[in-house]
Curated annotation (Swiss-Prot):
GO terms for biological process: proton motive force-driven ATP synthesis. Belongs to the ATPase C chain family. The gene is atpH. It is found in: Plastid, Chloroplast thylakoid membrane. The chain crosses the membrane at residues 4-24, 57-77. The record marks E61 as: Reversibly protonated during proton transport. This is ATP synthase subunit c, chloroplastic. The lineage of its organism: Eukaryota, Sar, Stramenopiles, Ochrophyta, Bacillariophyta.
Length: 82
């Protein structure tokens, strides 16, 4: 029974980090593309666009870090083992 719990924890950790990276990865690509397009249209607004982009990228990256924390908790501080 303990080996089943360990195997399920490893699979869940892999899914947690994998799924946590997909959404922010797509979002970061879209945000960067739109920022480049906005800077190309309005070069004078480059500083404002860049600041907003960096802030939004940090928020998106936080989601991936939360997934990593969950995966590490499942692997090393496994709450399912007694």
């Amino acid at each position: 029974m303990d080996s089943i719990i360990s195997a399920a924890s490893v699979i869940a950790a892999g899914l947690a980090i994998g799924l946590a990276a997909i959404g922010p990865g797509i979002g970061q690509g879209n945000a960067a593309g739109q920022a480049v397009e906005g800077i190309a249209r309005q070069p004078e607004a480059e500083n404002k666009i860049r600041g907003t982009l960096l802030l939004s990228l940090a928020f998106m990256e936080a989601l991936t870090i939360y997934g990593l924390v969950v995966a590490l908790a499942l692997l090393f501080a496994n709450p399912f083992n007694s």
